[in-house]
Structure formats: structure tokens, C-alpha cells
């Protein structure tokens, strides 16, 4: 059995920043993640997706953000338990014992759940024979955007993923169609502004008021995408790639059986320190829910700092935290004093 101060469930960007923040407070961390590598959705789903709302980075791709967060956490020597899930929780006095799907046992005083969407998978459009095209012409995630160079692409959806990828791929694709059932997008206002500018210049064609209806092609090679409007009028889009971005299916898995207050696949927390209904267990990032919650990586970073600040006295048996700015803990060379 491993003994540590904090167990962090989830090695996405928020979980990785929590490792750094815990290290700044002198806490040792073990991290559990179901994926084979760290990074969460940023690596598994969209490593090349540009992110625009990380402070000091006008633009950074998801993969690079994860690399920087890993480097930031590395001095504190976290222990990663990858390709395994946290499946069992037991309370032993002031300690928690977690068992993973690989029978790893970890004992800690604090648990930080930063599991993002939990176990996730794409919401697939209900199109006949779509599985025949998956992996060849239909993709739900993008790990190498260069393979779409010169292609005619239909992107479906109105959220951040659909809009941001339409903008990004317009630089290399021959043609981009963005299909959305209405003229209102849920992506960030700045992304929508860029999208409409590109539509005005002809770089992107907006197909508004339509939904996906059928696929046409042979042997997994797409030739066209059929869309229809509310009056059942159809329109054919000549394309060899379809990228449907309709969000993710969430599944909390074993976490749902831990006695936590769960609502619609999210864990309810207080909005001061992000503690759950079980003292010593916190939830941060996309998996956490409270009044006024914003699902932004930046907000998750702040939740990590607040929750670990609050957890300090539990880890160190009632000792008060003497708050210091990071500049007082590191020298000019960036090394810990």
C-alpha cells in the first residue's frame, strides 16, 4: 500500500495543476487516471486544438499546455497510476483508502476528484451505417489535423469544438462547411466573431437551419453528406470528411457509488472550497457543480488552489497555512528555495 498526503483522481489540466499546487503547500501526491497517458481530454480528444483563454498565452494547443503543466508539477515528484480507475473507497479513521482497477492501494488524508467528464465518449449522430465510415471519413476527435489538408470537410455542431475546429482547419482544408440547426452558437463570442468573419470571406460556408440526414459513399470513403431542414428539404454537400461535434457522454463509473451528492453526472460541492458532502473529499474542474459554475480550465485552476489551501490543515493535523506567494518560494533561477 502507498501512503501519501493527497490522491488526485484525473490527470487532465486541472488535475496536473492541483499536483503543482499541492507541491507548493508541501503535500505529496499520487495521481490516478484511466487513460494510458496524462492529459485527459486535451490529449485523448483534441491534442492539436487551439486554446485561447489561458492567461499569458494568446493561443496554445492542448498538447503543449499539458507538457507545460507536467513540467510545472515535475519538481514535486508526483506518482502516476495510469491506465487504471479508482473503483473502491474506504474510510479508516482520518484516512481514506482507495483501491484501483489494477488492485493498487493508496492511503491518504485528502482526495481531489478532477476527473473532468469522468469516463467519456462521443455523442454520435443517428445516421444509418455511420460505423462504416468511422475512422476513415468520419472522426469524432482530432489528433493530427494535417491529415485533413486539402479535404472538403463537413463539421456539425455549434459549440466550442465545432467552431474552433472550423476556424483552425480553414487554414489547410479545401472547403469547410459548418452545419448547425440554428444561427445561434454556444462557442465563445470571440470564436463566433472569427467564424463569421471567415464566412464572409468565403473560407467557411455556414449551413444554418440544417441537420445531418445521411451519408453517401463506398467502402468507408465519403463522397457527400446529406442535410435536411425543418421542412424536410434536403441538400447535398460534396465532402470527403465528416466531423460531428455533439459533446461527450459522461459516466462517473464507481465514483457514483461513493456516497457523494451527484446531480446529472456532476458532483455537488460548496462554492467556497469545493468540498463535497464528505469531509476531506473535494471535486474540481468540469466534474464539479455549484451555483455560478463556469466550465473553464482557468476556473479549474483556481478551484485547485482554493481546495488545497483549505485541505492544508487536515493534511498537517490542524496546522495553519502561512500563505506565501510563489515568488518567495522560488529563486530568480526558477528553482525552489
UniProtKB/Swiss-Prot annotation:
Required co-factors: FAD
Example GO molecular function: ferredoxin-NADP+ reductase activity
Binding site for FAD: 33, 41, 46, 86, 120, 286, 327
Pfam families cross-referenced by the UniProt entry: Pyr_redox_2 (PF07992)
Record-listed E.C. numbers: 1.18.1.2
Catalytically driven reaction(s): 2 reduced [2Fe-2S]-[ferredoxin] + NADP(+) + H(+) = 2 oxidized [2Fe-2S]-[ferredoxin] + NADPH
Cofactor note: Binds 1 FAD per subunit.
SUPFAM superfamilies: FAD/NAD(P)-binding domain (SSF51905)
InterPro entries linked: FAD/NAD-bd_sf, FAD/NAD-binding_dom, Fd--NADP_Rdtase_type_2, Ferredoxin-NADP_redctase_2
Gene3D superfamilies: FAD/NAD(P)-binding domain
Disulfide bond entries: none
Enzyme class: oxidoreductase
Keywords: FAD, Flavoprotein, NADP, Oxidoreductase
Assembly, per entry: Homodimer.
Family: Belongs to the ferredoxin--NADP reductase type 2 family.
Entries under HAMAP family matching the protein: FENR2
Protein name (database record): Ferredoxin--NADP reductase
Organism classification: Bacteria, Pseudomonadati, Pseudomonadota, Alphaproteobacteria, Rickettsiales
